[in-house]
Regions:
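Conserved beta-sheet core of the metallophosphoesterase superfamily
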Residues: 1-98
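Long, low-complexity serine/threonine/glycine- and acidic-rich segments characteristic of extracellular
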Residues: 90-216
């Protein structure tokens, strides 16, 4: 009777979009959307402190602390997630190595945590202005978050703040590998993510391609 539905949930201190169909017991043709919103306190105000003495508090799925806006137009809606302390354009976190070897294969990859993303969304990448290529959706821990977490385990002196929670698998993570034919020098990695509402977001990061230093 009501084909346009939306559920809102929270208090999990992570963020995800769930879609329920007939296999889940949902009896309508259009899948039911549940938006589980991230929190303003993030990971319970854990983590290192920023320049204002406020914990970074990235959530354990890699989503930054923040808040959401929902705009309704009739029976349609659009959700925007705003990372606290970041410009509204900051919709993803890109993880990649700073430098990769020239002319050789590497097991390193490019990871994109698209905060409002969900399985089935299109996330693409290109390097140095080449052709756009589709990234692979994965459900795994976010390496950006793991890098923050490992700082607490490898420091020689205890840092102010509190160690973040252990990571959980993110439901909005994508991965791609590096081609072997990149030239020496610095390259721009561009990421283009299209959300469930048809909007596109673009962010960039750089990577250097170098020859390994010769052993003395």
């Amino acid at each position: 009777d009501y084909p346009n539905t939306l559920s809102l949930s929270a208090h999990t201190h992570l963020q995800r979009n769930n879609f329920y169909g007939s296999e889940d017991g949902w009896r309508q043709q259009k899948p039911h959307h549940e938006y589980n919103a991230g929190t303003t306190s993030g990971d319970w105000y854990s983590g290192e402190l920023d320049e204002n003495g406020v914990p970074w508090s990235t959530m354990r799925d890699g989503t930054p602390k923040g808040y959401a806006f929902i705009r309704f137009t009739g029976n349609q809606y659009v959700i925007d997630y705003k990372a606290a302390g970041k410009p509204k354009e900051h919709q993803m976190e890109i993880y990649s190595p700073k430098v990769i070897p020239f002319g050789d294969r590497t097991s390193a990859g490019i990871f994109v945590n698209f905060f409002m993303g969900a399985k089935g969304d299109l996330v693409e990448y290109r390097i140095g202005g080449g052709d756009w290529k589709k990234m692979n959706y994965v459900e795994d821990v976010d390496p950006s978050y793991m890098a923050l977490l490992y700082r607490w385990d490898t420091t020689d002196n205890l840092m102010p703040g509190r160690r973040p929670s252990n990571a959980v698998e993110s439901t909005h993570l994508w991965r791609a590998g590096f081609p072997r034919d990149l030239k020496l020098g610095e390259h721009t990695i561009e990421i283009r993510a299209t959300d469930m509402f048809g909007r596109q977001f673009v962010q960039t990061k750089t990577v250097k391609v170098q020859k390994p230093a010769e052993a003395e």
